[in-house]
Amino acid sequence: MKDLVIGDLHFGIKTNSIAWLTKQIAFMEKQVMPLIHNHDRVIFLGDVFDIRYSINTQVGYEVKNMFRKILDSNPEVKFYIIAGNHDYYSPMIEFEHYNAYELILGEEFLKYHTNLHIAALLPILDNRTLMLPWYFTENDERYETTMKEYQGKFDLIYCHTECQHWSPEKIKLKGNAMVYAGHIHYPYVDKDNKLFNLGAACAFTFNDVNSSRYIYTIDDGIITEAYENITTPRFKRYYNDRIFTLTEDDLVNTSTQLCISPDNKNKAKYRERIKEIKSTYMDCDIKVVEWVDDQMGYDGPTANISTNIYEYIQQNIPSHLDNKFKKLTAKIS
């Protein structure tokens, strides 16, 4: 089977930002939809929605219309959505019946679009491919029972889990099957045990800094193509002298931090270059950040915790509080 596989999308990210929603829908229309007809199946690896306990009406409406358009345009292709932790009302297993897909899509939608299948309450087995909802990988007892029930019936698993933390016992239960998972937003590869987190389909915060995001063709269990997301915003950091060689391609459609050391921030050539960049690319989200080697000299999921907290607030603060936040941080700095 030739599958188009899509990692976490998190529609409703940035406190239901409509600007972000527009970019994400554009990504689906411009980059995903043209690829679908060349595949047998389309697999969503979970967390299609972001805010598990409350889905914004406009977000739900736009995403439902997007799915309707995709499904109606590709009646011969089978679509599978695997529920992730953000797709359930609660992370507690006793609330697993409350999920985003039944709420937003509804029973009539699913009855009409017979080529859409949701793995939220039970696993789905299709052509030796086992699709496991969040609760079936994160609950060890359920996982073990499921592996034994379907033993010998699958060669490929799609799910929503953190493969890096799978125990030897858990790996052994799956046998020789390839595992491709959503949940972790950056790629993780364990070739020896055939475990792969594919990463999110979009970059969302500065935890995703300076790295691209992809969707994939997986043909009979093997990745054969990777398609870079060039539609939704990228997150970039550039340090000190690098600001003097920045081009339009480095800055357009990005959230960018110019990381300048205390020794450089007051130098005239740096001040002039920063002023030039901001005036030339006024539509870009460009911020200047003081860079200290022992705090911010590296990027990614393990970055300095105080920096991460600042960035989280910066990226998620409601718009009506943004000016107050900027004034407060200006006083502190």
What is each PLM-predicted segment?
Residues 220-333:
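Accessory, non-catalytic peripheral segments of nucleic-acid enzymes
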Residues 15-17, 46-67, 83, 88-109, ...:
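Metal-dependent catalytic neighborhoods of phosphoester/phosphodiester hydrolases
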